[in-house]
């Protein structure tokens, strides 16, 4: 078999953070945030695409005002940008994080650096 299949949790109602794919070229995470949850504020450790598949994401980059993005949106975040992802408005926010190239290719840590 040439292809490789990855599975992710479906219909989660609690917070989920799964590192699904971690190859030399790309890193793909699956995240579910119930209302009121957020990811720790951190710096993007690669060129990031946020693929929102359920709910509405509130995203704050650097010192900008927060912006809301809904399911069906793909949001690009450049390398080394301070970011905060929150679920303020939806019962469930579900999204994928695609990091390409893999952070190691940019001499960045594999896990993002948290900030205040």
Curated annotation (Swiss-Prot):
Pfam families: Cupin_1 (PF00190). This is Uncharacterized protein MJ0764. It comes from Methanocaldococcus jannaschii (strain ATCC 43067 / DSM 2661 / JAL-1 / JCM 10045 / NBRC 100440).
């Amino acid at each position: 078999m040439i292809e490789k299949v990855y599975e992710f949790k479906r219909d989660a109602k609690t917070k989920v953070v799964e590192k699904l794919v971690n190859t030399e070229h790309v890193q793909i995470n699956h995240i579910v945030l119930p209302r009121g949850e957020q990811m720790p504020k951190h710096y993007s450790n690669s060129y990031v695409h946020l693929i929102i598949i359920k709910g509405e994401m509130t995203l704050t980059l650097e010192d900008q005002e927060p912006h809301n993005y809904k399911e069906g949106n793909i949001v690009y975040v450049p390398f080394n940008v301070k970011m905060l992802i929150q679920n303020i408005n939806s019962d469930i926010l579900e999204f994928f994080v695609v990091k390409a190239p893999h952070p190691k290719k940019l001499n960045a840590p594999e896990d993002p650096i948290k900030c205040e």
